[in-house]
Amino acid sequence: MQLIGIIEEDFINYKKISMTLEFPYCSFKCNKEYGSNICQNYQLNEYTIKDYNIEHIVSKYINNNISESIVMQGLEPLDSFEDVIEFIRYFRYVCNDDIVIYTGYEENEIKDKLLILKQFKNIIVKIGRYIPNEHSHFDRVLGINLASSNQYAINLEDYRI
């Protein structure tokens, strides 16, 4: 599995303490859409991509008494969809804790992927691109503030297409 980093104890991106997996790829759709470098995570593009063993990551998670969830974030996890699915499949063999996936895609752009992810329990997806000069708002599903008013999280167990 290719990542640019792992944060073993993250207190920021979800209401539960998380292990955060940082994914290495993104098409920088936000920058293209708004015609400027607005990406909050652009500097991550310069990080070194490393290969990680999924079993090792899951073992570190299971043996950490603090983390209660997994967060997958940017760059863009859904641009590494095969790695995302492979990780979730292995993780679900040993644990049913929440998995939160942060994406800058809009819901209509990823319905096919949401249907695939829906087969797994306790998957939450934060949807929506960052829009500059927007007011942040509290998202009840994540239990945190999101940067733009168009962004929201859905629990895929409640998701209907």
What spans do the regions from the language model cover?
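N-terminal amphipathic/basic leader segments beginning at the initiator methionine
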Residues: 1-11
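Canonical Radical SAM [4Fe-4S] cluster-binding loop centered on the CxxxCxxC motif
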Residues: 11-52
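A cross-family glycoside hydrolase active-site/sugar-binding cleft signature
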Residues: 22, 73, 100-104, 128
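Canonical radical SAM enzyme core domain
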Residues: 42-59, 78-119
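Glycine-rich phosphate/diphosphate-binding loops that line cofactor/substrate pockets in enzymes
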Residues: 60-65
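Conserved glycine-rich "GG(E/T)P / GGGxP" loop and the immediately following alpha-helix
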Residues: 66-94, 131, 136-143
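Conserved acidic residues
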Residues: 68, 122-123
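Classical nucleotidyltransferase
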Residues: 111-112, 123-161
